[in-house]
UniProtKB/Swiss-Prot annotation:
Gene3D superfamilies: Knottin, scorpion toxin-like (3.30.30.10). GO terms for cellular component: extracellular region. This is Fungal defensin triintsin. Belongs to the invertebrate defensin family. It comes from Trichophyton interdigitale (strain MR816). Disulfide bonds join 51-72, 58-80, 62-82.
Length: 85
């Protein structure tokens, strides 16, 4: 009985250490915080397209890019969502 418990603990611990030591499959380079901070802030101003206060601006934006309509949705209606039909 003791041997079975000891063998189980040993196998589980070896599997755990092998999983931790295994190399990562996705080694994509990370973006440094300085590069993100240096990016122009002009995109932040355009992100909402009038949402949540001016839904007409969102609608006009969506029509300008070839969509049928636009409305404010998502969390706290902060995202301009464009529809095709």
């Amino acid at each position: 009985m003791q041997f079975t418990k000891l063998a189980t603990v040993l196998i589980v611990s070896l599997m755990g250490s092998a999983a931790i030591a295994a190399p990562s499959v996705d080694n994509a380079p990370a973006v440094a915080a300085e590069e993100v901070a240096a990016a122009p802030a002009e995109n932040l101003e355009k992100r909402g397209f009038g949402c949540p206060l001016n839904e007409r601006e969102c609608h006009s934006h969506c029509q300008s890019i070839g969509r049928k309509f636009g409305y404010c949705g998502g969390t706290l209606r902060l995202t301009c969502i464009c529809g095709k039909e």
